[in-house]
Swiss-Prot record:
Binding site for Fe cation: C25, C27, C47, C50
One Gene Ontology CC term in the entry: cytosol
Reaction catalyzed: [3Fe-4S](1+)-[protein] + Fe(2+)-[Dph3] = [3Fe-4S](0)-[protein] + Fe(3+)-[Dph3]; 2 [3Fe-4S](0)-[protein] + 2 Fe(2+)-[Dph3] + NADH = 2 [4Fe-4S](1+)-[protein] + 2 [Dph3] + NAD(+) + H(+)
One Gene Ontology biological process: tRNA wobble base 5-methoxycarbonylmethyl-2-thiouridinylation
The protein's name: Diphthamide biosynthesis protein 3
Outcome of gene disruption: Sensitive to sordarin (fungicide), methyl methanesulfonate (MMS, causes DNA breaks), hydroxyurea (HU, ribonucleotide reductase inhibitor), thiabendazole (TBZ), sirolimus (TORC1 inhibitor), thermal stress, and cold. Simultaneous disruption of atf1 exacerbates sensitivity to HU and MMS. Global protein levels are unaffected.
Alphabetized GO MF terms: ferrous iron binding; iron chaperone activity; oxidoreductase activity
Alphabetical list of Pfam families matching this protein: Zn_ribbon_CSL
Cofactors demanded by this protein: Fe(2+)
Lineage of the organism: Eukaryota, Fungi, Dikarya, Ascomycota, Taphrinomycotina
Amino acid sequence: MSFYDEIELEDFTFDAGTNLYTFPCPCGDRFEISLEDLQLGEDVARCPSCSLIVRVIYDEDEFMEVDNDASTAPIIIAA
């Protein structure tokens, strides 16, 4: 896979309404990567208008999803 560039996530803009991080693309549109993609360990942002892609540099540990599954929670029994 050939990347146009490598860009730090902190240089992207986050839109809380769409949960997308975006960064300007040379074609005039914007590279996009979703919060969900980052939580899944993805590091590729794509431009929807052209074929360019960039590698997103970020700390994956900051985006790890916390498992709030009740089935793994401890059960407290009151006597």
